[in-house]
């Protein structure tokens, strides 16, 4: 690759081969204390420099810290689902909202949770770093759960024990409603803001071994479901009995313990410095491309500009090899006569190949990411329409009453079983790629929607006139929950690995947040679909719509089948983009920029002699 001398005021003035050979004969011996030995290093020995840096990075970290972060994830998830899993029933029973309104509000809230992940990822990658980002947002999360416990106790649960499905609550005051929404959106901000960063921070604790990091992401999702298991059984049961405040207080305690566990090993964590704001870097590529639109791209990518030596031009990032996608962006790395004539280089006119490839990576990931949104529409039904569907079914098994929200325990058990089957039976022999696993997850998700639609058809057939609940047992919902759980193992764990592994070093948190951003848009799309479907299908009293206040008068089965049909179309589009996708290729012999300046500086100075 063509090189620009970083010590020559940004001028493009490459040395000829003879001068370079003469300069490189000069050696500077650097004495480095390593335990009890003294090692002499040559200033141009990039391999040894890289090993020194990696050894320095690996002093801390390890699986012990990673396990602590998994515990933190489980406890934080317990607290989060203690709020979220029964939120739709809290809105209908305590806040007095209708089914469609409550389902929409839950979808919007859940979408906001995951949309805030982009905020956390940006702050982490650009300014705060992973540790500080996780700390700040977990503190916000604790404040939100605490405020929710307070407003429930003093404003909303009136009289005591109301909201159990039998005893109605008094209409909430305006102040109570305001504090309630403030608290739940603080919960959304705090939990969503730190989730993707926590996943990346956990991966940072491990060495650069793909299998170790793949195992961590599987355990990360496993820990999430362990925390959700307690919330979806014990907490849901008490909240279903009207003990809402007590359930929120348990969530508060879990959130506090999670924060303490996270802070405990602060000195033992392995830290990765933020790489700076990526937005200007990406924008520079497009601006430079536009300014050089008439420039002819060279046939040989080695003629494009790249920083010479092992160090990357982007702080905290390895070099990225040239790719054959979006070749028009290569113009940003073409060295023109204006760049060679001695004028000062302009970052908005000339970009390195690594910087161009960083922008290409973002563009290559977007089509894959967009195809995951419909799956998130499938997933979000579990927290809204699945619960409302179960609430109008026969929830008794003998004399034992099963809360509708507790049916998600079958989703969790399905995740446990599917994770074990995948890690110990499928993976050792087949080892499907992340893209293959995501496609499998989408297919299973379609099957879940079909199962939910068939269950709804049977539920409507067993409705007794004048009764709210159908005679169909709630156990008919088991297949749809099990299928959603199995699909998660393939889709969401695959997404975590794919977006984290394919994101450039300077955008790792953004890569992890794309998974949660997909969930966010999935919830918003679900809410939009409900509104559109109700607007089209509601025709007065004789046609109350597919999802009316009284579900026995609607056709929620058709809504499930609509989602399945859209997901099938999405799967075809996904196959096209998955086949088109070209993986990122890092230069493993390169050094993360901004971290090895001393030795590099010596070589640069010698080259100017």
Swiss-Prot record:
User: What is this protein called in UniProt?
Assistant: Protein NRT1/ PTR FAMILY 7.1
Key words of the record:
Membrane, Phosphoprotein, Transmembrane, Transmembrane helix, Transport
Say which species the protein is native to: Arabidopsis thaliana
Q: Carries keyword Transmembrane helix? A: yes
Record's superkingdom?
Answer: Eukaryota
Q: Which residues carry this modification: Phosphothreonine?
A: 133
Membrane-crossing ranges are: 67-87, 109-129, 136-156, 173-193, 216-236, 243-263, 367-387, 402-422, 438-458, 474-494, 516-536, 559-579
Q: Which CDD domains match?
A: MFS_NPF7
User: How does this protein sit in the membrane?
Assistant: Multi-pass membrane protein
Q: Name one GO molecular function term.
A: transmembrane transporter activity
Gene Ontology CC terms, in alphabetical order:
plasma membrane
* Tissue expression remark: Expressed in flowers.
SUPFAM superfamilies given in the database record:
MFS general substrate transporter
Q: Which family does it belong to?
A: Belongs to the major facilitator superfamily. Proton-dependent oligopeptide transporter (POT/PTR) (TC 2.A.17) family.
Record-linked InterPro entries: MFS_trans_sf, POT_fam
Q: Which Pfam families match?
A: PTR2
Q: Where in the cell is it found?
A: Membrane
Record PANTHER family = OLIGOPEPTIDE TRANSPORTER-RELATED
Gene3D superfamilies annotated for this entry?
MFS general substrate transporter like domains (1.20.1250.20)
Q: List the disulfide bonds.
A: none
Q: What is its main location?
A: membrane
């Amino acid at each position: 690759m063509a090189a620009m001398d970083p010590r020559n005021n940004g001028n493009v003035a490459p040395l000829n081969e003879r001068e370079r050979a003469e300069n490189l004969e000069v050696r500077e011996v650097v004495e480095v204390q390593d335990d009890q030995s003294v090692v002499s290093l040559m200033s141009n020995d990039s391999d040894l420099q890289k090993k020194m840096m990696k050894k320095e990075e690996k002093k801390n970290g390890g699986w012990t810290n990673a396990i602590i972060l998994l515990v933190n994830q489980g406890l934080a998830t317990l607290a989060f689902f203690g709020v979220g899993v029964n939120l739709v029933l809290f809105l209908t029973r305590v806040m007095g909202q209708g089914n469609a309104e409550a389902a929409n509000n839950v979808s919007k809230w859940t979408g906001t949770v995951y949309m805030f992940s982009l905020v956390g990822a940006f702050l982490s990658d650009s300014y705060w770093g992973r540790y500080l980002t996780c700390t700040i947002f977990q503190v916000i999360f604790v404040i939100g759960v605490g405020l929710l416990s307070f407003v429930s106790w003093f404003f909303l649960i009136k009289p005591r024990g109301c909201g159990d499905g039998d005893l109605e609550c008094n209409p909430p005051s305006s102040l109570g409603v305001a504090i309630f929404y403030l608290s739940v959106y603080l919960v959304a901000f705090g939990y969503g803001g730190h989730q993707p960063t926590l996943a990346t921070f956990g991966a940072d604790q491990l060495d650069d071994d793909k299998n170790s990091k793949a195992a961590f992401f599987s355990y990360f999702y496993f820990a999430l479901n362990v925390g959700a298991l307690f919330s979806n059984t014990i907490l849901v049961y008490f909240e279903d009995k009207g003990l809402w405040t007590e359930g929120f207080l348990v969530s508060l305690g879990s959130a506090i313990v999670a924060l303490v566990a996270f802070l405990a090993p602060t000195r033992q964590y392995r830290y990765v410095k933020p790489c700076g704001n990526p937005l200007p870097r990406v924008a520079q590529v497009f601006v430079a491309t536009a300014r050089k639109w008439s420039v002819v791209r060279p046939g040989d990518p080695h003629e494009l500009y790249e920083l010479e030596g092992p160090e990357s031009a982007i702080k905290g990032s390895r070099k990225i090899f040239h790719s054959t996608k979006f070749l028009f962006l290569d113009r940003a790395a073409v060295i023109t006569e204006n760049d060679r004539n001695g004028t000062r280089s302009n970052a908005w006119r000339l970009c390195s190949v690594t910087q161009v490839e960083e922008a290409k990576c973002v563009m290559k990931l977007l089509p894959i990411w967009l195809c995951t949104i419909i799956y998130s529409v499938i997933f979000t039904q579990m927290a809204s329409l699945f619960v409302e569907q179960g609430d109008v079914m026969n929830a008794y098994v003998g004399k034992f009453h099963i809360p509708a929200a507790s049916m998600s325990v079958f989703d969790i058990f399905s995740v446990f079983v599917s994770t074990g089957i995948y890690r110990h039976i499928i993976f050792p022999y087949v080892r499907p790629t992340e893209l293959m696993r995501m496609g499998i997850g989408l297919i299973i998700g379609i099957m879940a929607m079909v199962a939910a639609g068939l269950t709804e058809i049977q539920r409507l057939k067993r409705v007794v006139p004048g009764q709210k609940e159908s005679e169909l047992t709630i156990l008919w919902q088991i297949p749809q929950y099990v299928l959603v759980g199995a699909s998660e193992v393939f889709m969401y764990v695959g997404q975590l690995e794919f977006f984290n592994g394919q994101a450039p070093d300077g955008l790792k948190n953004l890569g992890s947040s794309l998974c949660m951003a997909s969930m966010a848009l999935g919830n918003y799309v679900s809410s939009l679909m409900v509104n559109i479907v109700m607007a089209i299908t509601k025709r007065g009293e004789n046609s109350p719509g597919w999802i009316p206040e009284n579900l026995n008068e609607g056709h929620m089965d058709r809504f499930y089948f609509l989602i399945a049909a859209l997901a099938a179309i999405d799967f075809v589009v996904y196959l096209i983009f998955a086949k088109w996708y070209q993986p990122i290729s890092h230069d493993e012999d390169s050094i993360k920029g901004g971290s090895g300046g001393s030795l590099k500086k010596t070589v640069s100075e010698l080259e100017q002699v």
